Amino acid sequence: MSAWRKLYYNTLNLPLKLLVKSKRVPTDPITELGLDTSRSFLYVLPYHSKADLLTLRQQCLSLGLPDPLQPIEINGTKLPAYVFIDDGPRVFRYYSPDPRKDSVKTFHAYLDAHRNNPHLDIEMLPASVMFGRSPGREGHNGVPHLRLLNGIQKFIAILWLGRDSFVRFSPTVSMRQMANEHGTDTSIARKLARVARIHFSRQRLAAVGPKLPARQDLFNKLLASKAIEKAIEDEAKAKKITLDKARKNATDIMEEIAANFSYEAVRMTDRVLSWTWNKLYQGINVFNAERVRQLAQDGHEIVYVPCHRSHMDYLLLSYVLYHQGLVPPHIAAGINLNFWPAGPIFRHLGAFFIRRTFKGNKLYSTIFREYLGELFSRGYSIEYFVEGGRSRTGRLLDPKTGTLSMTVQAMLRGETRPISIVPIYIGYEHVMEVATYAKELRGATKEKEGFMQMIRGLRKLRNLGQGYVNFGEPISLSQYLNQAVPDWRDDIDPIEPQRPSWLNPAVSALADNIMVNINNAASINAINLVSTALLASRQRALTKEQLLEQIDCYLQLLRNVPYSSDMVVPDKSSETLLAHALQTDKFQVEQDSLGDIIILPRESAVLMTYYRNNTIHLMVTPSLIASIVLHHERIHRDDLMKQVELIFPLIKAELFIRYEKEELPDVVNTLISELCRQRLICCADDGILRINPARIRPLQLLAASVRETLQRYGITLSLLNFAPEISRALLERESRILAQRLSVLHGINAPEFFDKAVFSTLVSTLREEGYLKDNEDILKADASALYQVIAKLMSPEIRLTIESVGVTEDNNSAQAIEENPESNMDK
């Protein structure tokens, strides 16, 4: 590098060091993109900008990557280590005025070098730099993305947006592979430049999103749609009002629903949240984000469908996506959050509000459906919670399919952009609402969201541990429909909304697939593991050595027999995980002369079931195997398999387990082998499985994870055994009553133990599996064999309590128990 050029770069670099603090996407490109820092890279930038080049250089040097300003020497010839694909503003034009020709020339020089040197392999590393990510407004002729700003404008942009800049690294491309597969002539060099240009264009659209419409223009377009025009006419006729009044009602609904996205609001909120997360959380862990970035770059319309644990989910996911180089989505939020000042803030951050129910309100449902379709057609990513509300128990709720159904209907409008649904697992080491959830499950009235509740909630924001966001396996909507409904395209109508007969069953199956994929992406943390172990102990206490032994048991199971390829298991030791969990002040430590005892306080037991339930689906199958071996003490492998196959459909439906019936034998055999390897059970050559007395405690604790689930099944099956002909409503009610009684008598702390939805799911599954038959409102049961299998897996005292209570028609006693469900929680 000449002295003059070095002076130029050093001079230009001075203000950049002060003004620019760029973020990397991905955060760790060395690991996520598999970059080898010992190799040489040709850095490919989208357009000519020395500010971008020097910003990239800062990040490269901090990562230990080669210096972009240091030429690469090949056989005595020095070639530049960077190339600009397109033109851009420059103060000094000592280069050729046409970077397009320069890029082709540089690519050809590298390809030619690879032709002459068979052992050479330079990798192209695409990298783009963005200062600000405002998409602009429709109808404005402003220059997009700072692409053609002159030197002064660029300086002002850097001055204002230097700390909102991103350096996006993309996967490398091997020049050796290009030369071998496509040749080395000039046409290949031109093709490389053209492909790079398209790559950067798509990448920028994924990061910035389409231009935003003026809100009133959007309303006018919606009002002009045939579906809404007809709904307005029907509204006027039904309510006997004028068309103008009906149109005013429609506009009011649009005002209530529609987002008012603002880039400046996102940018300022990002600064606040960055400070907030650093103060409140010890870290936000993000996994598998590259698959979403790739979908966005490939032009997919993305629907983010996370599980719903907390109000924090809204902010956390948008924050994570923004820092992954993606445009924050438009978010379907409950109308309960539309209060001052949260409502206007959320609306500027992309939230659109949805009522809890709009059954029977044709005008509202039509407007909401058309608004959702308009978001899709404009290319905005969307986020909604398919569970419909926050889980109060920590387990996934049964999905609500209304918005998902409208998403499928958007496909039936004939839009060409592919729609991909991305299930997302969100996990926390501390959920600030968990105490409120416990009160609501005890029967307390849900407190209405408002300004004062928000202020009280802010006071609880401290020591929140770590957060986890794991992007699950995407579901291509068109591919799903091709498999589920091969002729679905016959129902495409760009004007009239369609509700074909296949819609409801297809959407229900799709919703279940989404829930399974969310569970597949579970991210296990220290609180999940410690809570699971301590709650498995009847006294909610273990010595430190026992607890470490049990955490090790869980970790080995999860690592050696992974539930899915998307799940995340901590790579830390059990000692490190326990030390971290104890720092959260959720557990007590008592010391005596023999060592430490870790205790889960009685008042905290109900709260900690939430964190156990987040990942209970990972443990339930090995726990069932352990429970069968433990209670039988000696059982043949084939008999164990038969029992698992009988019980498993109930567990699969309740917890959205991924295993299909055909793969269950292989899964069970693999888990048995792992339990034998850990010496929890003994496996003989003749197929007999026995308990290992030397390792009985960890086997008991492992088996305990499924204990309450089996007890709940035993309750319903016992009632069916006692009264084979019973109405569904009475069966579900009596099951809940008996579960509440059992929890009081035996100190069962799990709030979901008598959850109405859980028993409803159980009865539905029993019906689907053929154990129940509908005869009008009466169920006819044939489930005695299943009950006998499950009854042998319960303790004698639990079984005695269950079987001593028959179905009672005494509504007074039933009502007394139902009106006081919190009695168990106070024990």
Curated annotation (Swiss-Prot):
Pathway noted in the entry: Phospholipid metabolism; CDP-diacylglycerol biosynthesis; CDP-diacylglycerol from sn-glycerol 3-phosphate: step 1/3
A Pfam family it matches: Acyltransferase
GO CC annotation terms, alphabetical: plasma membrane
Keywords associated with the record: Acyltransferase, Cell inner membrane, Cell membrane, Lipid biosynthesis, Lipid metabolism, Membrane, Phospholipid biosynthesis, Phospholipid metabolism, Transferase
Comment block on domains: The HXXXXD motif is essential for acyltransferase activity and may constitute the binding site for the phosphate moiety of the glycerol-3-phosphate.
HAMAP family: Glyc3P_acyltrans
Name of protein: Glycerol-3-phosphate acyltransferase
Organism per entry: Proteus mirabilis (strain HI4320)
Record gene name: plsB
